Amino acid sequence: MTQFTPKSAALFALSSLTMALLMQACGGSDDARAQTVPPADPIEGFWQSTVALQDCSSGAPLGGFRGLTIFAAGGAATADNNQPPMSKGIAIGTWKKNATGTYVAELRFWRYQPDGAPAGQQRLTRTLTLAADGKTLTGTISSVSLDTGDNAVRTVCGTENGARVGS
């Protein structure tokens, strides 16, 4: 069994102190790391929206749906809605803040025929404005349906009203 002598205790204390100082110098504290993380953008988070669609030319209403979106740090976006899951996939894409303070999200999802065969892709462009309190948003939507050859077959427009989910 090893006994601690004053010399071994001093060496242990010195090596422990050296290790603690090295960890601190390398960013071992939350304070050191927090200074390097940029502030979150106000749009980041989980949102629920209500969307009203219309024919872009005539303005005739085409129905609507409720949707969920996650705007992630760094500009990634993921969205889904309450439309039948067998008709479409989840929407993925990107978002960015414009110089005017509005946001543009570009998303895409796969569309399917009733028998499950591929029908093409849907491309969405959402232009969003956050309220001053950061808890609600409004926006416009432009949507282009593409066939399996990437030819435009339908264009739909819409409006969106959303609220942040959680804090």
Predicted regions span which residues?
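Acidic, glycine-rich flexible loop segments
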Residues: 105-134, 138
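Edge beta-strand at a domain terminus
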Residues: 100, 141-167
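Bacterial Sec-dependent N-terminal signal peptides
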Residues: 21-39
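Bacterial N-terminal signal peptides that target proteins for export
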Residues: 2-13
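Bacterial N-terminal signal peptides
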Residues: 12-24
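N-terminal glycine/threonine-rich, aromatic-flanked beta-hairpin/loop signature
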Residues: 59-102, 109-110, 136
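Hydrophobic/aromatic beta-strand elements that line small-molecule binding cavities or substrate pockets
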Residues: 66-71, 91-97, 122-132, 141, ...
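Tryptophan-anchored aromatic micro-motifs
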Residues: 39-61, 91-93
